[in-house]
């Protein structure tokens, strides 16, 4: 990757959910994501493979920037020990601006609740494209919405 075009951004969000519960929702039960955070991700479609398997291809319908954006991604890796999942963008709106883009989510247990870290690794198509810093707020909103829903479910 060219150093002037490549980048990495991260954000960490504290949540009340257990690390395992958040990880399972975000890595193992993707089909439930629209129920957990309908304001951020109203729809997700399985295009190829099986939901829980590396290599599966999904279309994420993101409510982002005042419109619905589609991101076609491959489920690249999952690590049950590190509570980490990586998705690589292979189509959709992001390929209009980025040569490569990965979404990495990792959850860290805390005494109470957990810490969710989102990392974006990317290479822009050209220097005129801004770094995707606004996606950090999207990640924070998404994380809080999932957490709120998981907490409501756990109290039922």
Label each residue range with its predicted role.
Residues 1-53:
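Hydrophobic ligand-binding cavity/cleft-lining segments
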Residues 36, 43-95, 153:
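Glycine-rich portal/gate segments that line the openings of hydrophobic small-molecule binding cavities
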Residues 86-141:
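Beta-strand/loop substructures that line and gate deep hydrophobic ligand-binding cavities in soluble
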Residues 22, 26, 58, 75, ...:
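Structural signal for hydrophobic/aromatic residues that build the beta-strand cores
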Residues 3-5, 50-52, 65-69, 95-99, ...:
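A generic structural micro-feature
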Residues 2-4, 133-156:
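C-terminal helix/juxtamembrane-tail motif
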Residues 11-13, 71-77, 101-109:
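Hydrophobic/aromatic beta-strand elements that line small-molecule binding cavities or substrate pockets
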């Amino acid at each position: 990757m060219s150093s002037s075009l490549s980048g990495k951004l991260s954000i960490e969000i504290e949540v009340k959910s257990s690390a395992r519960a958040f990880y399972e929702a975000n890595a193992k039960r993707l089909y439930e994501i629209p129920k957990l955070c309908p304001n951020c991700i109203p729809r997700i479609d399985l295009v190829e493979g099986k939901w829980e398997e590396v290599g599966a291809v999904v279309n994420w319908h993101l409510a982002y920037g005042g419109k619905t954006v589609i991101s076609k991604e491959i489920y690249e890796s999952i690590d049950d020990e590190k509570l980490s999942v990586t998705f690589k963008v292979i189509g959709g709106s992001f390929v209009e601006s980025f040569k490569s883009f990965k979404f990495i989510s990792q959850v860290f247990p805390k005494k109470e609740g957990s810490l969710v870290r989102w990392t974006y690794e990317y290479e822009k198509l050209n220097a005129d494209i801004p770094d995707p810093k606004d996606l950090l707020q999207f990640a924070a909103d998404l994380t809080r919405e999932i957490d709120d829903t998981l907490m409501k479910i756990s109290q039922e």
